[in-house]
Amino acid sequence: MPCKDNQFNQRNLSQKILLLSDTHGYVDEKILTYCQQADQVWHAGDIGDPEVMRKIESVAVVRAVYGNIDGREIRNQYPLDERFFVEDVDVWITHIGGYPGRYEPRVREQLKLNPPKLFVSG
C-alpha cells in the first residue's frame, strides 16, 4: 500500500535498508551479499538461531527484534520492539503487529497514541 504522506513520499532518502523477517534459523549466502550492499539491515523477528544474526552482523549494521519462536538467548539480545529515527523518519519494528483493521491490541493502542511514519511488522 503506498504511503499517503506526501512529505514522506517526496523525500530523497539516501540509505539502503534491507528488511528481513522469519529467517527461522537459516540465512542463505545470497542474502549476506545483499546485506553487504545495505546501509542497514532490519530483522523483524523469528530469527530462530543466534548464528543467523552473527552472520548478518559480521557484514552489516543491524537492528532487530525477537519473534514468537525465538528463545531466551535471542530475547536477551534483542527487544520486542525497536523504535528509532532514520533520516528523520520515525520507525517502529515489531514481530507480531497485525495489519490495518486487525492490529494486535498493544500495537493498536500505540499506533493511536504515537503513530510512527513507518511501521514494520514481521
Task: Locate each region found by the language model.
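Short intrinsically disordered, low-complexity coil segments enriched in acidic
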Residues: 1-2, 120
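N-terminal active-site segment of His-dependent metallophosphoesterases
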Residues: 2-62, 70-93
